[in-house]
A protein has these predicted regions:
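Short, solvent-exposed loop/turn segments at the edges of secondary structure
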Residues: 121-122, 159, 174-176, 220-222, ...
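Active-site-proximal loop and beta-strand segments within enzyme catalytic domains
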Residues: 64-176, 192, 228-235, 239
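Alpha-helical scaffold elements that line and support the substrate/ligand-binding pocket
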Residues: 48-55, 80-103, 107, 126, ...
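Bacterial Sec-dependent N-terminal signal peptides
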Residues: 1-26
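Secretory-pathway/luminal and periplasmic proteins that interact with or process carbohydrate-rich
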Residues: 57, 116-122, 132-138, 195, ...
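Catalytic-site signature segments of enzymes, centered on catalytic residues
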Residues: 140-220, 243-259
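Catalytic loop of the DD-peptidase/beta-lactamase superfamily, centered on the K-T-G motif
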Residues: 24-61, 146, 187-190, 196-200, ...
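Mobile, glycine-enriched helix-loop/loop "lid" segments at the mouths of ligand-binding/catalytic clefts
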Residues: 218-230
Length: 361
């Protein structure tokens, strides 16, 4: 019945010329925000979507998908999403917890017996970036392995003996190593590779047919090419073996697939509501102070209401997604150049849409 009422409302809105004018004005304002950052029509660009109640109300693309071939971006191009991958990793861990195969309170030595101080670091610490372990992306020796094929165990061995930055639970410090560990634990517990687990239990289940574990070798239709900007102009992105970022940043997706992802989270298609909510709450440090990160999402506020946010950055690509639960507003943006960031653009769009729709009420 609720869906029928929404469809009737949308139909009436479509018939009302005043609402069409309202939508056009909103679109013009959104365009202006994006064009202020994405200025080069002949360079790499970005794609953006705004959805309300699960339905797109704005979709537009800017710039080139491939500069050399002069191919324009369209809304259905596939982008590397970088650290937005962490959302999928966190939900996968919660799925395993719901199945009784692990708990977020488990210490990691239960799964990796030789991990230094593994009896003090929990899965919860990894999920919330409070483990204190060394972030491998900050290690100078990363360049030595960046283009090598690494197994999850090899990745863990790469950073596990580094001196820790702080005791588990003492502070929040964004950490990619923690999410690599989560992917490794997922494989040990499930008996599946991370790639296969996400593909089978999430992407296929939700019909996210344009999303996958990233690869530079496979031919992928509608793939956006990544770029970097130097003083001399644009160059192709730095090559990285995706086994290195692994479960911390190796997925590819589209605007429409990410909307399916958000819709599935809203409808609890992957987890029971009480388990899903674990990802979207703030947690406390050892001193009792709350910090603004759940499991795979930053939990912040925008104009006095809660927002769930996460971005991503990997060679040649940037991404950003913002969800406002109280208004069911989802804004997502992708860029195929590290010279154009969708982060502030997406936040500004979300704020504009929130303010506009709130006033319209």
């Amino acid at each position: 019945m609720r869906q029928i009422k929404i469809l009737i409302l949308l139909f009436l809105i479509a018939l009302n010329p005043l609402n069409k004018v309202f939508a056009q004005k909103l679109n013009t304002k959104i365009d202006k925000i994006i064009r202020a950052e994405f200025k080069d029509k002949n360079g790499p660009g970005g794609v953006f979507m705004v959805a309300k109640n699960g339905n797109p109300i704005y979709q537009k693309s800017f710039g080139k998908a491939n500069i050399e071939l002069d191919v324009n971006l369209t809304n259905d191009f596939i982008f590397q999403i970088g650290s937005m991958t962490k959302q999928f990793t966190a939900i996968s861990i919660l799925m395993l917890e719901e199945q009784g195969k692990l708990t977020t309170n488990d210490t990691i030595n239960k799964y990796i017996p030789d991990y230094p101080n593994g009896n003090k670091i929990t899965i919860h610490h990894l999920l919330t970036h409070t483990s204190g372990i060394k972030d491998f992306t900050k290690m100078k020796s990363l360049r030595e392995i960046a283009q090598k094929e690494m197994t999850p165990k090899m990745m863990v061995d790469f950073f596990k003996n580094e001196v820790v930055d702080f005791a588990p639970g003492e502070k929040f410090d964004y950490n990619n190593s923690g999410y690599v560990l989560l992917g490794y634990i997922l494989e040990l517990v499930s008996g599946e590779t991370y790639e296969d687990f996400v593909e089978k239990h999430i992407l296929q289940k939700l019909g996210m047919s344009q999303s996958s574990y990233a690869t530079d070798r496979q031919i992928i239709n509608k793939r956006a090419y990544g770029y970097k900007k130097k003083e001399s102009g644009y160059v192709n992105k730095t090559v990285i073996n995706f086994s290195v970022p692994f479960s911390s940043g190796s997925l590819m997706s589209t605007l429409n697939d990410m909307l399916k992802w958000q819709d599935a989270l809203n409808k609890n298609l992957l987890l029971k509501a009480e388990n899903s909510e674990k990802a979207f709450k703030k947690y406390k440090l050892n001193n009792g102070q709350y910090f603004t990160y759940g499991y795979g999402w930053h939990i912040r506020e925008m104009n006095g209401v809660t927002s769930r946010e996460h971005g991503g950055s990997i060679f040649g690509f940037k991404s950003m997604g913002v969800y406002i639960p109280s208004e069911d507003i989802y804004v997502i943006g992708f860029s195929n150049c590290d010279c154009n960031s969708p982060t502030q653009v997406t936040l500004d769009i979300a704020k504009l849409v929130l303010e506009t729709l709130t006033k319209k009420k």
